[in-house]
Amino acid sequence: MTPVRMQHSLAGQTYAVPLIQPDLRREEAVQQMADALQYLQKVSGDIFSRISQQVEQSRSQVQAIGEKVSLAQAKIEKIKGSKKAIKVFSSAKYPAPERLQEYGSIFTGAQDPGLQRRPRHRIQSKHRPLDERALQEKDFPVCVSTKPEPEDDAEEGLGGLPSNISSVSSLLLFNTTENLGKKYVFLDPLAGAVTKTHVMLGAETEEKLFDAPLSISKREQLEQQVPENYFYVPDLGQVPEIDVPSYLPDLPGITNDLMYIADLGPGIAPSAPGTIPELPTFHTEVAEPLKVDLQDGVLTPPPPPPPPPPAPEVLASAPPLPPSTAAPVGQGARQDDSSSSASPSVQGAPREVVDPSGGRATLLESIRQAGGIGKAKLRSMKERKLEKKQQKEQEQVRATSQGGHLMSDLFNKLVMRRKGISGKGPGAGEGPGGAFARVSDSIPPLPPPQQPQAEEDEDDWES
């Protein structure tokens, strides 16, 4: 006889230990007990082996995590005493797989040992004969009360009708929820079942005015509500000012090779009005104005000035004339020339241009009053070049003394690169003038123009 297997197992439960049935023969009961104990031993051995495998797997994971922790601790100990700034780059993604591994039970893939075919045993003994005594042993009397409990199903009626109702049709009221019964149940979904009578209904049917608002009853004035502003208004807030030194030497855990410049980078409130940085002042000369070229937002050094043209020999040799004698001579010459040769360009010119006492006469008069070339305080080109060179060196020294400014370093590097490209660097063997100065020196000066004064005026107007 094979043992009966219980099928009340849960979902995913693999093992099912058989139970020993009652009323078995002695030999049969002993055989089933031995089979059940053997099956239970196999099941317990399989369960504990799977648990030990899971524990070993978890222990290996914990050991790998411990190795990572020890490696990170060793790196921290190595850089703990360093005073250099170290950048730590963290991964942009969380160090985990995109799809987590689903949890699997440790009993997945387990097979029920009871499904294997077991040996069959032949039993010689016979069953015990069933008699009256055996039936009485199996009989268990149970007291059960079969008396039904009385149910209270009596429902309360609606009560009596009013005395003025004479027919059934009077009970039908069109488009109302009122019941003519003296006592009925009014169903309210919010308050529940409420029993009302006609007296209560009569009190409710009286129309009442609503209470007056507080502004009328208590004569209070309503406060005007201020509309809320949902626009974004950036506010820097009150930032505490901390007066600390810029360099703190010999502090543990503090780097000494970092420099922070507050002017670089945008502010925390881009829409707030920012402070305008102070621009450097440039000194200009009277004889030659300094032109600053801007290329892509970077200052470029000014080009070398060309050599001055040679002075005319007539002005250098002739003594300066007084303004009283020079004016009538010039006017007489202009009158003779204008009467002899009248060009169409002069005839079509306006009156201010034809008038000889215009801006040109005042310019010549101011030159004569200044004393001419002999008394003019002019400097040579070598002095100008030396002064410009000294100014550049002072600006470079001032920029390097400030230290750490990004724009000044970039400007100095660009200046040195341009000097190296143009051949004006410190390693070049040429003089301060360079190749351009030597070429300009080799060009002979132009001869002075030998033309009358009237033709000069006509050429000026045509140009």
Swiss-Prot record:
Residue span, WH2 domain: 359-381
Chain positions covered by the region annotation Required for WASH complex assembly: 1-54
Location relative to the cell: Early endosome; Early endosome membrane; Recycling endosome membrane; Cell projection, Lamellipodium
Query: Residue ranges of region Disordered?
Result: 295-463
The annotated regions of Pro residues compositional bias extend over: 300-312
Gly residues bias (residue ranges): 422-434
UniProt cross-link Glycyl lysine isopeptide (Lys-Gly) (interchain with G-Cter in ubiquitin), position: 218
| PROSITE patterns listed in its UniProt record | WH2
Instruction: For this entry, list what GO says about its biological process.
Output: Arp2/3 complex-mediated actin nucleation; early endosome to late endosome transport; endocytic recycling; endosomal transport; endosome organization; exocytosis; protein targeting to lysosome; regulation of Arp2/3 complex-mediated actin nucleation
The biased composition feature labelled Acidic residues covers: 454-463
Basic and acidic residues compositional bias, start-end: 380-396
Q: Which family does it belong to?
A: Belongs to the WASH1 family.
Please give the function described in this protein's UniProt entry. Answer: Acts as a nucleation-promoting factor at the surface of endosomes, where it recruits and activates the Arp2/3 complex to induce actin polymerization, playing a key role in the fission of tubules that serve as transport intermediates during endosome sorting. Involved in endocytic trafficking of EGF. Involved in transferrin receptor recycling. Regulates the trafficking of endosomal alpha5beta1 integrin to the plasma membrane and involved in invasive cell migration.
Could you describe the subunit structure of this protein?
A: Component of the WASH core complex also described as WASH regulatory complex (SHRC) composed of WASH (WASHC1, WASH2P or WASH3P), WASHC2 (WASHC2A or WASHC2C), WASHC3, WASHC4 and WASHC5. The WASH core complex associates with the F-actin-capping protein dimer (formed by CAPZA1, CAPZA2 or CAPZA3 and CAPZB) in a transient or substoichiometric manner which was initially described as WASH complex. Interacts (via WHD1 region) with WASHC2C; the interaction is direct. Interacts with alpha-tubulin. Interacts with BECN1; WASHC1 and AMBRA1 can competitively interact with BECN1.
In Swiss-Prot or TrEMBL terms, this protein is called Putative WAS protein family homolog 3
